[in-house]
From Swiss-Prot:
Domain PA as annotated: residue spans: 66-171
Pathway in which the depicted protein is active: Protein modification; protein ubiquitination
Gene: Rnf149
UniProt protein name: E3 ubiquitin-protein ligase RNF149
Pfam families xrefs: PA, zf-RING_2
ZnF RING-type: positions: 265-306
Biological classification of the source: Eukaryota, Metazoa, Chordata, Craniata, Vertebrata
Domain-level remarks: The RING-type zinc finger domain mediates binding to an E2 ubiquitin-conjugating enzyme.
Catalytic activity: S-ubiquitinyl-[E2 ubiquitin-conjugating enzyme]-L-cysteine + [acceptor protein]-L-lysine = [E2 ubiquitin-conjugating enzyme]-L-cysteine + N(6)-ubiquitinyl-[acceptor protein]-L-lysine
Phosphothreonine, modified sites: T327
Origin species: Mus musculus (Mouse)
Length: 394
């Protein structure tokens, strides 16, 4: 009987994950990417105490979302006191130490108090060529995106609080500070749009439905497989019982029925030896018991003539399909297995019950081959026959 293959686990889940991965990798599904540029900020001023020029440069700025990405330079101007450092008022006036006439200058204001747009417009009214916003103190050295749509063609960047406050204090002391703004590194920041979230949610739900359907199918297959295995185990148990009813015989030393030098087992291809236990099949072929029993459990047929042993014994199929054990063609009162004759116990009883006159008339007769009392022997299909006068029953 061909073995049923157990359903492989994990195939449906892998297919569902592949569908989800394909959905996420489709062009345009990822939502989009935020592009922004860092700014190189360099400052230069003369230290009044040492009369030395101090110069520093760092990539510490970030261009605003609506800012022009161009280079700008000029003296730094801050809101004139007592105006707040945020520079939110439309009429805010700026002071830039060292500025001459219409020379370009850069407005430096603090974050907070109003929108970025209001700060940029207030500085643009004073003809600032660029606006620098320094971040809040709580944010430390970080910079953040700035939204200032509608401010026109003006350069707007954000710098960190420590850097901005350092420049602001220098300007308030009346020290001219020259600032140069240059384009830094281009950055791409991925983000997922709302449409992409919906698409991923649909893909995930689809994956869950596929996985659930596969799990249902898998467990149905597993249930059927377990049931078939349970049936096969019961099948083997019944087959073992039937095989156990086949007659056994122990080979004896000097036994005329078996030539130990010529006879061999067709399963293991070895000669029969004294004290070997052999199994006798309905087809009269004999084999080692330890060889033929496992064979019959798997094949049910004689290795030599292919007779279905189980059916031949009448223990297989529906009751109406049950076959009777065929009567082997042998002499009445014995079953011939090769050269081996196994005498029926019923015939022995018949011999013992014969009248004395029959014995006297028959004359001396040869002793019959009898099995040991402990051996399991059987007459397979042989009909009972009446003893005849003048002959010996063997």
């Amino acid at each position: 009987m061909a073995a049923r293959r157990r359903p492989a686990a994990g195939v449906g889940a892998r297919d569902a994950l592949a569908v989800l991965a394909l959905a996420l990798c489709t062009p345009g599904v990822g939502g989009g990417a935020l592009e922004w540029y860092s700014a190189m900020v360099s400052i230069e001023y003369v230290d009044p105490q040492s009369n030395l020029t101090v110069w520093s440069v760092s990539e510490s700025g970030r261009f605003g979302e609506s800012s022009l990405r161009e280079e700008r330079q000029g003296l730094v101007g801050v809101p004139r006191a007592p105006a707040p450092a945020e520079g939110c008022a439309p009429d805010t006036r700026f002071v830039a130490p060292g500025a001459l006439g219409n020379a370009p200058w850069v407005a430096l204001v603090a974050r907070g108090g109003c929108t970025f747009k209001d700060k940029v417009l207030a500085a643009a009214r004073r003809n600032a060529s660029a606006v620098v916003v320094y971040n809040l103190e709580s944010n430390g050295n970080a910079t953040e995106p700035m939204s200032h749509a509608g401010t026109g063609n003006i350069v707007v960047i954000m710098i960190s609080y420590p850097k901005g406050r350092e420049i602001f204090d220098l300007v308030q002391k009346g020290i001219p500070v020259k600032m140069r703004i240059e384009i830094g590194t281009r950055h791409m920041q991925e983000f997922i749009s709302g449409q992409s979230v919906v698409f991923v949610a649909i893909a995930f739900i689809t994956m869950m439905i596929i996985s659930l359907a596969w799990l249902i199918f898998y467990y149905i297959q597993r249930f059927l497989y377990t049931g078939s295995q349970f049936g096969s185990q019961n099948h083997r148990k019944e087959t073992k019982k039937v095989i156990g009813q086949l007659p056994l015989h122990t080979v004896k030393h000097g036994e005329k029925g078996i030539d130990v030098d010529a006879e061999n087992c067709a399963v293991c291809i070895e000669n029969f030896k004294v004290k070997d236990v052999i199994r006798i099949l309905p087809c009269k072929h004999i084999f080692h018991r330890i060889c033929i029993d496992p064979w019959l459990l798997d094949h049910r047929t004689c290795p030599m003539c292919k007779l279905d042993v189980i059916k031949a014994l009448g223990y297989w199929g529906d009751p109406e399909d049950t076959q009777e054990l065929p009567t082997p063609e042998a002499a009445p009162g014995r079953v011939s297995v090769g050269n081996l004759s196994v005498t029926s116990q019923d015939e022995e009883r018949s011999e013992s019950n014969l009248p004395s006159s029959s014995s006297s008339e028959s004359g001396p007769h040869r002793p019959c081959l009898k099995e040991d009392a402990g051996e399991d022997t059987a007459l397979l299909g042989a009909g009972r026959s009446e003893p005849q006068h003048g002959g010996s029953i063997c």
